[in-house]
Amino acid sequence: MAKYIGPKCKLARREKTDLFLKSGVRSIDTKCKLEQPPGQHGQRRGGRMSDYGLQLREKQKVRRMYGIMERQFRNYYKEAARRKAATGTALLQLLESRLDNVCYRMGFGSTRAEARQLVNHRGVLVNGRVVNIPSYQVQPGDTVSVKEKAKSQLRIQAALELAQQNGWASWVDVDATKMEGVFKQAPDRADLSQEINESLIVELYSK
């Protein structure tokens, strides 16, 4: 699957918000000029953005935040539309239940990309078994842990230390000493970023 390997700040500046693509050791404001569009001098566009433009921009923002390509993101939307919960909420819950994202929430990586790499390199266990599929859907009650051989990696230790300082999400229960945690439940909408307007994504895909 193709993936974006260019500057992370460029994506954040395009969306004018922190996409959490870079390590949280330093503030995003010291790394990226979020108020300045990408380009040598910050390309300026006049006029009001169309409704379609707003919907597309929101979809791109969320897709990039979770590091997912278009086809897979659309498949998540289709799955969310089949669920009983509100489609937008179900979409976010599916994204949050990805193994790479759960590892990120537990502090096993300082970014989702870092957590995904740990999963790809067979450094993560789910209920005691190695799972190397980043999109694996973690279920409520599942225990996610760092493989014994990977626990000595300095970047994992640094990420956990940062997570301890910032605090963990309410839907995971983490034992930093053991480098393991329990995915208690899919998060409620109120627990997630209010900067995401998932209704715009639903409007875009429902056309």
UniProtKB/Swiss-Prot annotation:
tRNA-binding listed as a keyword: no
Keyword RNA-binding: yes
Any one of the GO BP annotations: ribosomal small subunit biogenesis
Any one Gene Ontology molecular-function term assigned to this protein's record: structural constituent of ribosome
Listed GO CC annotations: small ribosomal subunit
CDD domains named in the record: S4 (cd00165)
S4 RNA-binding domain ranges (all copies): 97-159
Subunit record text: Part of the 30S ribosomal subunit. Contacts protein S5. The interaction surface between S4 and S5 is involved in control of translational fidelity.
NCBIfam families listed in its UniProt record: PRK05327.1 (NF003717), rpsD_bact (TIGR01017)
Similarity comment: Belongs to the universal ribosomal protein uS4 family.
Summary of the function given for this chain in its UniProt record: One of the primary rRNA binding proteins, it binds directly to 16S rRNA where it nucleates assembly of the body of the 30S subunit. With S5 and S12 plays an important role in translational accuracy.
Record-given protein name: Small ribosomal subunit protein uS4
Organism: Halorhodospira halophila (strain DSM 244 / SL1)
Gene name linked to the record: rpsD
